Amino acid sequence: MEIVSRAWESVDWDRIQTRVEAEVTALGQRQDDSEIRKTRLVEESNAYRGRTNKDSRKVAIPLIKAFQSEFDGLLARSTAAENALIDICKSIVSLPDPKSLLKGAEAWKNDAEKTQKAVEEREELKRQLIKVNNELEDLRGKDVKVRKLKDKLAKLESEQDIFIENAVNEVEKKAEQELNDRLTELIAEKEKMKEQNEILEKNMDSLESKNKDIQRKLEIAKQTVEQKDGLENEQLSIAMKDLADAKHKIVFLEERVSQLENEAEKVNESKKAGNIEDIAALGSVLVQKDDVIQQLTNDIKRHEASHVEELAKWKLAVSAVEKKNKTLIGELNELKNQLESRNDYEAIKNELRLLREIEFGDSAEANAESIERLGETVETLDRLLAEKNRRLQNENASLRVANDGFKGRNEEQEAELTVLKEKSERNDRLIAQLEADLASAVQDIGIPERMGTNEMLKDAPAPTISDASLVPILTSQRNRLHERVTSLEEAISLEKTKQLSVQNEIERVREENIRLCERIRFLQSPGGQQQANVEAGLGNDFRNGNRNKKVSLHDKTTLNMGRAILATPKSRTVFFSYLLILHALIMLVLYKFAFDQSVVRDAETECEYKFHQHMLDNHKQ
């Protein structure tokens, strides 16, 4: 009613009156124009009748009649419309003003609504009173039953309490039993891990000892090969010198035999021309010469036989030495290949040291200073990795629990968001429906259609809606709902980002855990020389230091000299040069000694030969 009254108040009656007057004036003007057009049409018809003959007029008469009838119909229609419009305007002007009635009707409507509400409340109170009376009568009749039910309820509550206590005790017992079982399992696993660690330490010690034995055998093999090579070379040089001496002796003896043969020929020649007195002396000399020649030939044969035997022996010895040298060279090449295949020991050692320093900090320094600073024994690499693995597993479990909590919260928020979205959509639909209803109500406000004034009120201004209407309230409520939905969406997006970050952290921890497990498996794999090298170089420095204290003085000196020689390429080169020079000096000294002995023997034989020649030439003896 308020809207209808406001619509009637917003009607501009003066503008409507002015428009009606203007429309009446326009009707008179249009009527005058139609009379002028009618007279002109009559004139044109007369002119057409005068210009044309009878036959042509007969042809055009139906058209003219149809046109005339249409014109008369339009004229009658226009006259009827104008008369109806004038009557409607008169009736509108003669209508009374309904504003006071509308205001009174609004008050009457409010009073009627209040009266209706009061009547409804009165009826509702009557019904409630009747219902309460009935219930009161029922309750009075059921007092005994209520008491029985109360007693039964108390009994059931006591039984329920007893049942709950028993169930709680059973659950506590089960939980305690499961906890004890879990503790026993954990203790067993801990003992098993300790046994495995002890086994691994024993394996590491055995691998270290094997590595040292292999290195010591390699050094011994190198020394034996070098010594055998030197001895074989020396023996070969001595044999060659002896062979050369034997050749010189053979040549000397052949020359001596040739000289004796010449002397014998000379003696035979002198025998023919000599005196008879010298026959006895020459016979004795010839006998002596024959004996000497026989002795020399025997010596030559004996020397040749011994030379052949010694040459065969030396050939066999040389072939055996060559075979042994080949086998030693093969072993040496195999050991060199093994060393070349494991030449990344220093790199792995440095990388693992850096890894320990980066991953574990001060706990990775295995020396006396770090022990004094930390106040405890430094743990080995596998134990540190196992501890870190356990720590990462605990962090992974906590992150998994947090992730489950985030997932639960996320699901709850998503469910709440869906509910809020449904509410928002329902509110949007209600708001749209209310807006459509309000728009239709506003459009329907005005003069009813039965009065026939809709076309006249087309240009009227739209009725204004009061600020006290429901539209601002609904729009503000919709805005609040939109803001709440946006805030919830932002919170959900934030939770999703947190969940993604937690999942990424879990993946990173899992990858790091897998990498650490692979490193532990690599370090715990049996039969690997690199493990022995790594653990010997990194994990057991303190134990090696204690073991080195028990080594004797000459072993320490030998080990230190070996380390000093094999430490750098320069030291190895210097040591090799020193051995080569020393070997050359020894060979030169031996060669000089053998040469001096051969020269002395040659001088003795030459002196003996000259003395014998002198005795023959001068003293005939």
Swiss-Prot record:
Q: What are the GO BP annotations of this UniProt entry?
A: intra-Golgi vesicle-mediated transport; regulation of transcription by RNA polymerase II
Q: What are the GO cellular component annotations?
A: Golgi membrane; nucleus
- Could you list the residue ranges forming a coiled coil in this record? 101-445, 473-525
Query: Which residue ranges does UniProt annotate as crossing the membrane?
Result: 575-595
| Signal peptide feature range | none
Which residue intervals are topologically Lumenal? Answer: 596-621
Q: Does the keyword Coiled coil apply?
A: yes
- Provide a Gene Ontology MF annotation, just one: DNA-binding transcription factor activity, RNA polymerase II-specific
Q: How does it sit in the membrane?
A: Single-pass type IV membrane protein
Record InterPro entries: CASP_C
List where in the cell it is found.
Golgi apparatus membrane
Query: Which ranges does the record list as Cytoplasmic topological domains?
Result: 1-574
Q: Which cysteines are joined by disulfide bonds?
A: none
Q: Which domain of life is it from?
A: Eukaryota
Its annotated function is as follows: May be involved in intra-Golgi retrograde transport.
Family that this chain belongs to: Belongs to the CASP family.
Report the protein name in the record: Protein CASP
Organism field:
Caenorhabditis elegans
